[in-house]
C-alpha cells in the first residue's frame, strides 16, 4: 500500500511539473523576452510604405521641457488587437471593470467615463489586419474599404433601408436611411420645399449653414448636405448600431460620438440653424422634456427642429398620445409648426423673448435662472429650463449673422462677449491665412490635393485656421479647451463647427479619424495643467490616421521633447520652420511630422 501511494504521488508531481512547464511556454510565447507587443511591430519599410529612417539615432540632448534627463524611449508597447477600436472614455469594458453605478434609462452608460491614470492603455493602437489608406474624398462618401472597418452587421440589419451594402472588398453607401430609403438627397429637397426655400435648396441662400443631426446613423443626411454648403454635426452613441460614427468618419463626413443623456452637449448656445431627428428613437417627453430643451439651447433664434417619426403621422393610440403630449410641450416652449407633411413635422423656435414673457406664471418648463450660463458645457448637467435671449439678442430679433460664405469672414456678433474688436478679428484671420500658406508649403512635397480630408484644430481660438482652409476640400473639427475663453460660439457664428474638450482626457472619437492635427501650443498648455504630455502624444497618435500629419506650433523645447519620441511613435519629421510672423509667437517653431503606416507581425502573417 505504501509503495502504491508513493507511486501515485510521484505521478501527480510529474503531472504538475508538466502543466507548469506548458504554462511557462505559453507565457514565453505570448510575451517573449523583449515584450511580444512591442517587438511585433514591422515598419512600413517592409511593405514599401512610410519613411526609411527608422534606424536614425535620436538626439539624446533633447530636453523634456527644459529638463535634460538623457532618456530616449526606444518603443511603446502595441495594444492587443482587441483594442484596435479603443475609445478610452467610451469604453464599456472600463465601465464594467470599475463597477460604475450608472442609470441605463438616462443613457449614462453612453456618456464619457474616463479611466484613471493607473488604468490607461499606454500603448499604440494597432490598425486592423490588412488596413489600407482610406479612399479619397469625394469617392469616399459612397464607398470605403471593408478591411478598415470590418463590421458588416449594419449592412445586414438595415439591408431594407439602404444604409450600406457590402460589395466585394468595399462597403457602399447608397444614401438611404431608416426614414429615407430612396435617398437622402430627395428627402433634403422635400424639407426645403416644405419651408418654401428657393429651388428646393435647403441652405436658403446661405442663411441655413450649421445643422445638428442627432441619432444620425452612418451620417448620409449630413454627407448629402455638404453639396449645398451646409455643415452638419452628426452625432450618435456607440450603441447597438456600433461603428456607425466610425463609418461616417471613414467616409470623410463630419461626425462625433455622443448622446443626449444627462450632460450638456459640448456645443455653445445658439450654434445651429437646424436640428434633425429621423427615427432617432429618443423619448423627448422624459424628465419634463429635458432633451428637447437641450436642443432648444443649441438652436439659433428662429431655428428649426425637423422631426421625422411615426408620432408625426401614425394614427394608433400610443403614437397619437405621444404626439399630443409632444405638441403641448413644444407649444409651452413657444415653438410653432413651420410645416407638416406626410411623416415629417418642422417646428420653429421664436426669434425673441416675447412669447416667453407672455406665458402664464408657473408655466412649465420654466425659464432658466439668470446665473445659468448657457455656454458652460464641459461636464455640466442639463437642466429642464428654457434658455431665453439676452436683451441685445431680443432686440436684434435673430442671430444677426451674414449668409454663407460672407459669414466666414464677417466679424461675429458675439465678439463683444470677449472684448474683441473687429480689428483684432480681421488681424487674426489674416495672420492664420499666412500661416496656413506656410504649412502647405512645408507639406507640399508629401501631399496632393486630395491627401487630407478630416482635420482637427486642437486649440482653435476664433477658428481662423479653419477659415483659411475654405478653398480646400476639407472639414475641420475645431476644439476649444475647456479652461480657456469659450470662443467656440464665435466659431459657430462663422459657419464652422467644433466642440469643447479637455486634452487631459481622450477625445470622443474612434482611432484613425483624422488626416491632419494642428497642435498650436497645446503641448505646452497640457504641461502647465499638470497633465501628461506623453499621454497626449499617444492620444494624438490614436486619433491620427496612418500616413497622417501633425503640425506642431510650439516652443523649441517642446519640439525637442517631441523629437525624442519620434522613433517610439513611428513618426517621421517632414519639415521645420522658425516662426517669425508675429510678436506673440516669436519664440515658436513650426514642426511637422508624419505618422508611418505600420502593421503588427500578426497582420503581416495574415497578409502572407
UniProtKB/Swiss-Prot annotation:
It is found in: Golgi apparatus membrane. GO terms for cellular component: endosome; Golgi apparatus; Golgi membrane; Golgi trans cisterna; plasmodesma; trans-Golgi network. InterPro entries: Put_SAM_MeTrfase, SAM-dependent_MTases_sf. Its main location: Golgi. Residues 34-608 are lumenal. One of its GO terms (molecular function) is methyltransferase activity. Glycans are attached at residue 342. Its EC number is 2.1.1.-. It is an enzyme of class 2 (transferase). GO terms for biological process: methylation. The chain crosses the membrane at residues 13-33. Residues 1-12 are cytoplasmic. It comes from the Eukaryota. Keywords: Glycoprotein, Golgi apparatus, Membrane, Methyltransferase, Signal-anchor, Transferase, Transmembrane, Transmembrane helix. It is a single-pass type II membrane protein. Co-expressed with the galacturonosyltransferase GAUT1. Belongs to the methyltransferase superfamily. This is Probable methyltransferase PMT3. The lineage of its organism: Eukaryota, Viridiplantae, Streptophyta, Embryophyta, Tracheophyta.
Amino acid at each position: 500500500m505504501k509503495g502504491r501511494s508513493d507511486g501515485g504521488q510521484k505521478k501527480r508531481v510529474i503531472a504538475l511539473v508538466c502543466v507548469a512547464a506548458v504554462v511557462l511556454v505559453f507565457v514565453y510565447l505570448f510575451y517573449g523576452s523583449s515584450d511580444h507587443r512591442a517587438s511585433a511591430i514591422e515598419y512600413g519599410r517592409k511593405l514599401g510604405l512610410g519613411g526609411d529612417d527608422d534606424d536614425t539615432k535620436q538626439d539624446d540632448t533633447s530636453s523634456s521641457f527644459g529638463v535634460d534627463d538623457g532618456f530616449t524611449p526606444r518603443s511603446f508597447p502595441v495594444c492587443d488587437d482587441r483594442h484596435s477600436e479603443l475609445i478610452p472614455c467610451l469604453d464599456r469594458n472600463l465601465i464594467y471593470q470599475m463597477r460604475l453605478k450608472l442609470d441605463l434609462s438616462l443613457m449614462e452608460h453612453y456618456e464619457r467615463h474616463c479611466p484613471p491614470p493607473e488604468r490607461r492603455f499606454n500603448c499604440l493602437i494597432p490598425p486592423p489586419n490588412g488596413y489600407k489608406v482610406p479612399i479619397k474624398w469625394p469617392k469616399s462618401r459612397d464607398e470605403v474599404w471593408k478591411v478598415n472597418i470590418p463590421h458588416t452587421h449594419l449592412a445586414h440589419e438595415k439591408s431594407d433601408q439602404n444604409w450600406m451594402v457590402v460589395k466585394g472588398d468595399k462597403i457602399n453607401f447608397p444614401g438611404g436611411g431608416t426614414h429615407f430609403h430612396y435617398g437622402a438627397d430627395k428627402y433634403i429637397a422635400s424639407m426645403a420645399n416644405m419651408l418654401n426655400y428657393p429651388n428646393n435648396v435647403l441652405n436658403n441662400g446661405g442663411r441655413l449653414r450649421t445643422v445638428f443631426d442627432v441619432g444620425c446613423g452612418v451620417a448620409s443626411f449630413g454627407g448629402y448636405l455638404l453639396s449645398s454648403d451646409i455643415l452638419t454635426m452628426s452625432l450618435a452613441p456607440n450603441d447597438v448600431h456600433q461603428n456607425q460614427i466610425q463609418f461616417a468618419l471613414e467616409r470623410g463626413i463630419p461626425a462625433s460620438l455622443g448622446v443626449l443623456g444627462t450632460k450638456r452637449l459640448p456645443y455653445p448656445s445658439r450654434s445651429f440653424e437646424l436640428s434633425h431627428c429621423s427615427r432617432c428613437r429618443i423619448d423627448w417627453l422624459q424628465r419634463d422634456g429635458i432633451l428637447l430643451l437641450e436642443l432648444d439651447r443649441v438652436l439659433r433664434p428662429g431655428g428649426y427642429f425637423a422631426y421625422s417619426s411615426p408620432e408625426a403621422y401614425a394614427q394608433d393610440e400610443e403614437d397619437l398620445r405621444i404626439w399630443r403630449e409632444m405638441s403641448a410641450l413644444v407649444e409651452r416652449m413657444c415653438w410653432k409648426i413651420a410645416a407638416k407633411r406626410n411623416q415629417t413635422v418642422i417646428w420653429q423656435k421664436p426669434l425673441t423673448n416675447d412669447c416667453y414673457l407672455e406665458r402664464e406664471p408657473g408655466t412649465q418648463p420654466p425659464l432658466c435662472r439668470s446665473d445659468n450660463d448657457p455656454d458652460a458645457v464641459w461636464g455640466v448637467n442639463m437642466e429642464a429650463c428654457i434658455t431665453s435671449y439676452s436683451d441685445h439678442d431680443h432686440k436684434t430679433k435673430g442671430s444677426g449673422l451674414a449668409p454663407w460664405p460672407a459669414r466666414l469672414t464677417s466679424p461675429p456678433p458675439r465678439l463683444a462677449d470677449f472684448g474683441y474688436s473687429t480689428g483684432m478679428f480681421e488681424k487674426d484671420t489674416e495672420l492664420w491665412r499666412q500661416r496656413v500658406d506656410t504649412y502647405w508649403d512645408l507639406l507640399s512635397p508629401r501631399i496632393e490635393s486630395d491627401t487630407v480630408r478630416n482635420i482637427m484644430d486642437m486649440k482653435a481660438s476664433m477658428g481662423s485656421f479653419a477659415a483659411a482652409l475654405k478653398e480646400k476640400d476639407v472639414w475641420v473639427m475645431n476644439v476649444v479647451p475647456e479652461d480657456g475663453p469659450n470662443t467656440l460660439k464665435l466659431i459657430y457664428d462663422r459657419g464652422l463647427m467644433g466642440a469643447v474638450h479637455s486634452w487631459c482626457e481622450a477625445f470622443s472619437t474612434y482611432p484613425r479619424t483624422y488626416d491632419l492635427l494642428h497642435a498650436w501650443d497645446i503641448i505646452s498648455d497640457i504641461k502647465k495643467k499638470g497633465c501628461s504630455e506623453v499621454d497626449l502624444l499617444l492620444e494624438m497618435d490614436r486619433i491620427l490616421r496612418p500616413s497622417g500629419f501633425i503640425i506642431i506650433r510650439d516652443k523649441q523645447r517642446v519640439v525637442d521633447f517631441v523629437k525624442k519620441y519620434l522613433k517610439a511613435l513611428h513618426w517621421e519629421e517632414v519639415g521645420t520652420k522658425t516662426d517669425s510672423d508675429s510678436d506673440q509667437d516669436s519664440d515658436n517653431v513650426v514642426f511637422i511630422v508624419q505618422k508611418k503606416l505600420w502593421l503588427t507581425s500578426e497582420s503581416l502573417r495574415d497578409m502572407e
